[in-house]
């Protein structure tokens, strides 16, 4: 509910799946945009992936290419034909995506964390390959081409940067809570005292101390380590 509330504050459109749609695995729900007749073009991304100038340049090149679909691979770990959170296309080419997903799941009952990508390989790639721009840093397939030049941001200078990276996995900040509590609202403040973000967290016990663990993007955590930014909090429970 908190996430939905935050999205609404940023004027995001929230679409709830219906009862029938909710019966397929949640990782497949994002593909339902392909059945939305109000959508002209779609880009499907993981909710926790980092948006970058490199991705922006790649998408711009796709939009100017005349191709119906766009696929990106940017890591040695990106070894599927279509990464479930790194592709896009024009609507109207793939028909009845929900039906395709239901039929596939009836045949393949072994649902796991990569089932969505296996579905894309087995059922969708044969359509996508007919008109696709593939950006591929490691040339998984002959259809891949290099990424265009792009503006370099600070985050794109780190050694492990790639499109689709989950940047908040790279650093966990532990903050001691000195007041006895069960739950706090913490704030990330910059050098000017401005609030960058704020979330609720439950207290954990570690070595006799009360702490909260916060996963932050590399850029944010580096600011804390250099004592330029700080974490403050208020007790909720």
Spell out what each predicted region is:
Residues 51-82:
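Conserved donor-nucleotide/metal-binding helix-loop-beta segment in metal-dependent transferases, i.e.
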Residues 27, 31, 56, 116-118:
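Conserved glycosyltransferase catalytic-site signature
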Residues 39, 66-67, 181:
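Short, high-confidence coil segments that cap the C-terminus of an alpha-helix
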Residues 47-49:
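Short acidic donor-binding/metal-coordinating loop in glycosyltransferase active sites
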Residues 33, 69-71, 86-88, 119:
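Conserved hydrophobic/aromatic beta-strand scaffold that supports enzyme active sites
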